[in-house]
Amino acid sequence: MASFTATAAVSGRWLGGNHTQPPLSSSQSSDLSYCSSLPMASRVTRKLNVSSALHTPPALHFPKQSSNSPAIVVKPKAKESNTKQMNLFQRAAAAALDAAEGFLVSHEKLHPLPKTADPSVQIAGNFAPVNEQPVRRNLPVVGKLPDSIKGVYVRNGANPLHEPVTGHHFFDGDGMVHAVKFEHGSASYACRFTQTNRFVQERQLGRPVFPKAIGELHGHTGIARLMLFYARAAAGIVDPAHGTGVANAGLVYFNGRLLAMSEDDLPYQVQITPNGDLKTVGRFDFDGQLESTMIAHPKVDPESGELFALSYDVVSKPYLKYFRFSPDGTKSPDVEIQLDQPTMMHDFAITENFVVVPDQQVVFKLPEMIRGGSPVVYDKNKVARFGILDKYAEDSSNIKWIDAPDCFCFHLWNAWEEPETDEVVVIGSCMTPPDSIFNESDENLKSVLSEIRLNLKTGESTRRPIISNEDQQVNLEAGMVNRNMLGRKTKFAYLALAEPWPKVSGFAKVDLTTGEVKKHLYGDNRYGGEPLFLPGEGGEEDEGYILCFVHDEKTWKSELQIVNAVSLEVEATVKLPSRVPYGFHGTFIGADDLAKQVV
């Protein structure tokens, strides 16, 4: 997430929680630190329970741990030499602005942070960041790696480079990609920061200076932080012209490129090196064709090979644009979709002939900051609706809007057409309260897997929970269907069991017709994230494997599980050399596609 000064958005991710950890040796603990120790300008900092290897003393204390959980001691790292060079004017301006920020921080210290912006909650336990990990090969495997799995599994996540100065939401962290490569019957692992423009500048400055969209931009102090950022930009201390995003949410492999994405910027191309390492190529604008941001969940049509995407703006009209790319990367003209107000549109869906655009009740109202509130607002007076637009429309004049009251789906898992009833069927997880991820709420979060039917003839909609038995309802968030059938009718969805929220205790294989649920649980004190379904070579929809990172909070070890998607039995477990924090979305790049990678 980046500042709301340009297009900003948020990704479907869960919040931090409190965890405990066992004593660790110094060698085991090294992967629990932040990134390398870096020079830092003198400043007043808010005293937090989260400390970092970036600062002295070199210890990382996880907040709100049990009394028998000691501090984790890490070795200080050598300081980087590539610090930002400033002229006399810039040094003077930086000192003055740092002093102003110190005053602002001292003011913020007088007010308690909500849980949704409290670093001691948001990046506690296995939500905390890790160091980069160079490639480690020939990892231990329990069981046998399936012969058909050849390629690399990559997963994105938020991993803040620096200790938060004030408020921090889990979504605010810098992007880090974790990669497990399968080759010659063995597995390797690496993780690297995506070196965004924001990341590179903050690394040079040795401190966080870009505004955090959720953790910091609230009320008058949020406005003050924006003004500080503008002033630093005017003085040449920071340069937002080449992007302010974190690239921490989605991943897509398209036209020979792996793209890391967040809604607040252009995508970043990340290269998978021949030995399984990760290297940031740079900000990718599709050869000069993409001039706006792009949401983190573009869709690749499995039949045509085209990429479909949206871009939304929270400041100026048009608030929403739709576009597509041909398989060779040629972009279509933008289709401007008229909205009355800027709206959070984290995800959307495609069918064979249409794009399905959710216009829901979580909106951006920047004037709320003037009144002391959050700019991310649940608008109870707005009626949620879905727009159905022809995939190849040249404008939005024929978009058909269908109301779907009180429906907020952070993610849409699939959609398809049923011509016999003139309906478009949408599968999504309906979340209540809609803004609970961003704003504190007394109501427990619920995420109900739902079937939404949009009748193109009558303009009416219906919605039903797919799991009809109320006693069997569980929070289902983060997952997918068979990607080879995206936009076509699917029988199964594979979704994270987001319980106890915000942790993920396993995943569910759900029959979308009958509501039957089969669960794979990770076990006591073991949690994971989004399950990735990797289709097999056979003809059955559910033939294949499910890949998921799992972390044991008792042993403080992480692994990659490979689960048979039919039987839900674990076929192999790859033991990882360092901790993998809970994260967001991933994808799999087969060996054949990897061989065609653009470098």
Swiss-Prot record:
Signals that turn on the gene: By salt or drought stress and pathogen.
The reaction(s) this protein catalyses: a 9-cis-epoxycarotenoid + O2 = a 12'-apo-carotenal + 2-cis,4-trans-xanthoxin; 9-cis-violaxanthin + O2 = (3S,5R,6S)-5,6-epoxy-3-hydroxy-5,6-dihydro-12'-apo-beta-caroten-12'-al + 2-cis,4-trans-xanthoxin; 9'-cis-neoxanthin + O2 = (3S,5R,6R)-3,5-dihydroxy-6,7-didehydro-5,6-dihydro-12'-apo-beta-caroten-12'-al + 2-cis,4-trans-xanthoxin
Pathway where this protein functions: Plant hormone biosynthesis; abscisate biosynthesis
Cellular compartment(s): Plastid, Chloroplast stroma
Segments crossing the lipid bilayer: none
Tissues in which the protein is found: Localized in roots, leaves, stems, empty silique envelopes and seeds. Expressed at the point of organ attachment and the abscission zones in the plant.
Presequence boundaries: 1-40
UniProt keyword Cytoplasm, yes or no: no
Residues holding Fe cation: H297, H346, H411, H585
Additional remarks: Overexpression of NCED3 results in increased accumulation of abscisic acid and resistance to water stress.
Family indicated by similarity: Belongs to the carotenoid oxygenase family.
Name of the protein this chain belongs to: 9-cis-epoxycarotenoid dioxygenase NCED3, chloroplastic
Source organism per UniProt: Arabidopsis thaliana
Gene: NCED3
